[in-house]
């Protein structure tokens, strides 16, 4: 649940008549009204106050209708559904004095709505809509999520290392990826964001998880999604680089060698990787047993038209495996 907040500035003031506070400021002049969503729900009584020293001659309109909704410095409305949300504007004569935008956050049967984002069907066991990965222990990580919504969509991302840790985590703006992902038999759009912990010590033991919150607004609907993780749990190295083959004299085997990816943490004697080596036949389904090694080379057979592929992961903590890097036997 999003922390509930009360806007107490004298201008553009938004108040509730109900005893339980269910409205808070998302950004300047934009407010989220939290509603229990069920048939015949009473909704929330909201009082809007015009941001002006003027007292007389004030009228109110909304973006749903040009008709005058009321007059005076305040306007009381009952917010029950999306038709009651939107932008409310106060005027005097032909001049706009101020406006407030109301968004709705639905709760059905005690659960906040999650309509905007979609879960990746490739990971049916995933408990979160947000997926994050880090290529190393530098404190830099990338997160992404999927949505079937293509227009009237806005995201903001917030992150921190625990709620009381002063070390901030800075996230950039969410960007739309060119990649399309199939979810529920239709294409979904993928958004990504890059984040960096301000004061990161790669060799230090993590005691507090990183908290990530993505706020999503689609038209007049507000939702938020969160994830909590340690960097060590989202590590996924880049693939090994510079794969090379060296024929061995009087042997059917070859020596395949590789190097640590440039993006992996150093020194490698401390931040060590382990590797998986596999021979893949001409037809992709023809795969031989996997060989696991800690060094950066291995001896394998390399039939004509086959290829050798290698992937990496953290040696001392069971991180995710990297993508495969491959070299042809031809």
Curated annotation (Swiss-Prot):
Keywords: Cytokine, Disulfide bond, Glycoprotein, Immunoglobulin domain, Secreted, Signal. It comes from the Eukaryota. PROSITE patterns: FN3, HEMATOPO_REC_L_F3, IG_LIKE. SMART domains: IGc2. Disulfide bonds join 50-90. Its main location: secreted. The keyword Glycoprotein applies. Residues 1-22 form the signal peptide. Transmembrane segments: none annotated. GO terms for molecular function: cytokine activity; cytokine receptor activity. Residues 23-106 form the Ig-like C2-type domain. GO terms for cellular component: extracellular space; membrane. It is found in: Secreted. Cytokine that can act as a growth factor for activated T and NK cells, enhance the lytic activity of NK/lymphokine-activated killer cells, and stimulate the production of IFN-gamma by resting PBMC. Associates with IL23A to form the IL-23 interleukin, a heterodimeric cytokine which functions in innate and adaptive immunity. IL-23 may constitute with IL-17 an acute response to infection in peripheral tissues. IL-23 binds to a heterodimeric receptor complex composed of IL12RB1 and IL23R, activates the Jak-Stat signaling cascade, stimulates memory rather than naive T-cells and promotes production of pro-inflammatory cytokines. IL-23 induces autoimmune inflammation and thus may be responsible for autoimmune inflammatory diseases and may be important for tumorigenesis. Belongs to the IL-12B family. Heterodimer with IL12A; disulfide-linked. The heterodimer is known as interleukin IL-12. Heterodimer with IL23A; disulfide-linked. The heterodimer is known as interleukin IL-23. Also secreted as a monomer. Interacts with NBR1; this interaction promotes IL-12 secretion. This is Interleukin-12 subunit beta. It comes from Lama glama.
């Amino acid at each position: 649940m999003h922390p509930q907040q009360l806007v107490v500035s004298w201008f553009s003031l938004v108040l509730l008549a109900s005893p339980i506070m269910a409205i808070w400021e998302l950004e300047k002049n934009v407010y989220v009204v939290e509603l229990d969503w069920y048939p015949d729900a009473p909704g929330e009584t909201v009082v809007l106050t015009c941001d002006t020293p003027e007292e007389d001659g004030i009228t109110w309109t909304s973006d749903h209708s040009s008709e005058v909704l009321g007059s005076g410095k305040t306007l009381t409305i009952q917010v029950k559904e999306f038709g009651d949300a939107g932008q409310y504007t106060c005027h005097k004569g032909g001049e706009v004095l101020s406006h407030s935008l109301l968004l709705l956050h639905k709760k059905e049967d005690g659960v906040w709505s999650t309509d905007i984002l979609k879960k990746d069907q490739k990971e049916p066991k995933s408990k979160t809509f947000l997926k994050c990965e880090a290529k190393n222990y530098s404190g830099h990580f990338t997160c992404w999520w999927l949505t079937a919504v293509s227009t009237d969509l806005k995201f903001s991302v917030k992150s921190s290392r625990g709620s009381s840790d002063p070390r901030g985590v800075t996230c950039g703006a969410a960007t739309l990826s060119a990649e399309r992902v199939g979810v529920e038999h239709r294409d979904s759009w993928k958004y990504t964001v890059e984040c960096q912990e301000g004061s990161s010590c790669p060799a230090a033991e993590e005691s507090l998880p990183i908290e990530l919150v993505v706020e999503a607004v689609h038209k007049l609907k507000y939702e938020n999604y969160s994830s909590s993780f340690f960097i060590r749990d989202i590590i996924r190295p880049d693939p090994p680089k510079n794969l090379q083959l060296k024929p061995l004299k009087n042997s059917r085997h070859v020596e395949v060698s590789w190097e640590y990816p440039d993006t992996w943490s150093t020194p490698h004697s401390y931040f060590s990787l382990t590797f998986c080596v596999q021979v893949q036949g001409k037809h992709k389904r023809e795969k031989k047993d996997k060989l696991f090694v800690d060094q950066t080379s291995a001896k394998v057979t390399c039939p004509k038209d086959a290829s050798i592929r290698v992937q990496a992961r953290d040696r001392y903590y069971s991180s995710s495996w990297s993508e495969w890097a491959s070299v042809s036997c031809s």
